[in-house]
Every structure is written in C-alpha cells, then in structure tokens.
C-alpha cells in the first residue's frame, strides 16, 4: 500500500491519539505529545462528523482539563492549530487555550 506523506502523518497522529485516549481512560495524566495528539485528532474527527469550524473551536476547549494532563502542560499549549478536511475543503481550525 502506497501512502502519501499527508496520509502517513494522519495515521501517525491517529495512532498517538489512540494511545493518549487509552492512557486518559486509565486515569493517567497526559504529557505534551499525548495531549496534542488527543486534541488534534478529536478536531479532525469532529470535522469528519460534519461539525463546523466554529463548533470545533468551542469543542476543543472542552476535551481536556488541567486534571487530565501533567503539571505545566496547559501553559505549554496556548493554542492548537489543525488542518481538517470539511465537505467544502480543508480549513485551519485554531483552538485558543484548549486546556482551561
């Protein structure tokens, strides 16, 4: 199977997000890469589900709390920017202060 670089990136992100999701479900606090992967994939999947950019910007702030991540992680992630594919094309979704 031949994959484009973009497809490889999406698969890597999805794999990292699955690991983060499982660790979060077990009650472990997420580190920086896990938190970024988790937030990014939820946004990409939300776009796939048909949500709008505005909905995803608001939704992105509800995914993780300070209790879900290691100390200092919220300050390391002032915003998350993800390119997501919508029915009308690819758009950049920016979530400010994703871990309030």
Swiss-Prot record:
GO terms for biological process: urea catabolic process. It comes from the Bacteria. Keywords: Cytoplasm, Hydrolase. It is found in: Cytoplasm. It catalyses: urea + 2 H2O + H(+) = hydrogencarbonate + 2 NH4(+). The keyword Hydrolase applies. One of its GO terms (molecular function) is urease activity. Pathway: Nitrogen metabolism; urea degradation; CO(2) and NH(3) from urea (urease route): step 1/1. It is an enzyme of class 3 (hydrolase). Its EC number is 3.5.1.5. CDD domains: Urease_gamma. PANTHER family: UREASE. Heterotrimer of UreA (gamma), UreB (beta) and UreC (alpha) subunits. Three heterotrimers associate to form the active enzyme. This is Urease subunit gamma. The lineage of its organism: Bacteria, Pseudomonadati, Pseudomonadota, Gammaproteobacteria, Oceanospirillales. The gene is ureA.
């Amino acid at each position: 199977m031949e994959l484009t670089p973009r497809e490889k990136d999406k698969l890597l992100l999805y794999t990292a997000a699955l690991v983060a999701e499982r660790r979060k479900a077990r009650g472990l606090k997420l580190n920086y890469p896990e938190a970024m992967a988790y937030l990014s994939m939820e946004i990409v999947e939300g776009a796939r589900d048909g949500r709008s950019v505005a909905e995803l910007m608001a939704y992105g702030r509800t995914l993780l709390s300070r209790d879900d991540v290691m100390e200092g992680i919220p300050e390391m992630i002032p915003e998350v920017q993800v390119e997501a594919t919508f029915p009308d094309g690819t758009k950049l979704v920016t979530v400010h202060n994703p871990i309030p």
